[in-house]
């Protein structure tokens, strides 16, 4: 149901029906509001957000079972009725927690992606991603559990570059073919959270759908009235640093070179002797990381 143009083409090819007529409906969920927030005070932000939606059904997605348990406990301690759901729980517990959510005995379910497949609760008003999803397909499916009754749904994702690094290390343990596919999907998800353009436009374009309005009015970027910023000087510094590093520098090494933070890796490459060493120390490492990603 969330097939990209490439996936649809592969399906037709593998089923040997390449000349078949295809029918698609719009991927646009006009009643959903999309937002991405920096992962700084994520627990505090989530509690505030859930309290703003007090009494309404919400799903909080986390990538690990441990984080699911931690967040569920945190919410309970802060007076928010919630239960965990992940594959590490026995089937009886999972069934009880799922039923409690569907019957509205609890308002919030904190879950891994194990939750939601085949679940149709029409009045979910809030979907939070504590961690960046592994792909835009997963993101679309999971946010799509909000507002199925046609009512308003809010979808908030918290993003940190450290999450990307964790997922990248996890992929490194996979077979080479899976690594390549996984990293490509992860790059698309990263592109979505970092885009300064309309999130709805980005998402629909990924699924091969043309969305003409430049401003959807229902995402943080379109409502934020972003201002233009001339980043030419910074971009040139980044490119010069990459060239000076002779392809040895990854994002963190580029950033550390610009702010003048020596590490064992940079010492090996003699980064201190580069013209770019400390050239960007007037800006934070977060500024340079974001600019590199853009």
Regions found by a protein language model. Give the residues of each.
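Accessory DNA-binding and partner-docking regions appended to nucleic-acid-acting proteins
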Residues: 181-182, 212-294
């Amino acid at each position: 149901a969330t097939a990209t143009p490439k996936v649809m083409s592969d399906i037709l090819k593998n089923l040997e029906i390449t000349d078949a007529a295809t029918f698609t409906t719009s991927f646009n969920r006009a009643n959903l509001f999309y937002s991405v927030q920096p992962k700084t005070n994520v627990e505090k932000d989530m509690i505030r957000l859930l309290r703003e939606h007090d009494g309404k059904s919400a799903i909080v997605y986390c990538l690990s079972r441990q984080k699911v348990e931690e967040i569920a406990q945190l919410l309970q301690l802060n007076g928010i009725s919630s239960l965990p759901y992940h594959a590490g729980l026995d089937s009886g517990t999972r069934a009880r927690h799922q039923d409690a959510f569907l019957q509205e005995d609890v308002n919030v379910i904190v879950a891994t992606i194990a939750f939601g497949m085949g679940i149709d609760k029409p009045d979910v008003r809030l979907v939070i991603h504590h961690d960046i999803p592994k792909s835009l397909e997963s993101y679309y499916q999971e946010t799509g559990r909000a507002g199925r009754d046609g009512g308003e749904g809010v979808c908030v994702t918290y993003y940190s570059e450290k999450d990307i690094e964790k997922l990248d290390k996890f992929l490194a343990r996979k077979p080479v073919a899976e690594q390549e596919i996984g990293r490509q999907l992860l790059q698309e998800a990263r592109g979505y959270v970092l885009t300064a353009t309309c999130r709805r436009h980005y998402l629909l374009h990924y699924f091969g759908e043309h969305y003409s309005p430049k401003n959807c009015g229902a995402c943080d970027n379109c409502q934020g009235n972003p201002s233009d910023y001339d980043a030419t000087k910074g971009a040139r510094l980044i490119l010069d640093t990459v060239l000076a590093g002779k392809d040895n520098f990854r994002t963190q090494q580029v950033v550390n070179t610009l702010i003048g933070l020596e590490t064992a890796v940079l010492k090996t490459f003699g980064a201190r002797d580069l013209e770019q060493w400390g050239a960007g120390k007037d800006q934070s490492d977060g500024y340079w990381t974001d600019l590199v990603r853009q």
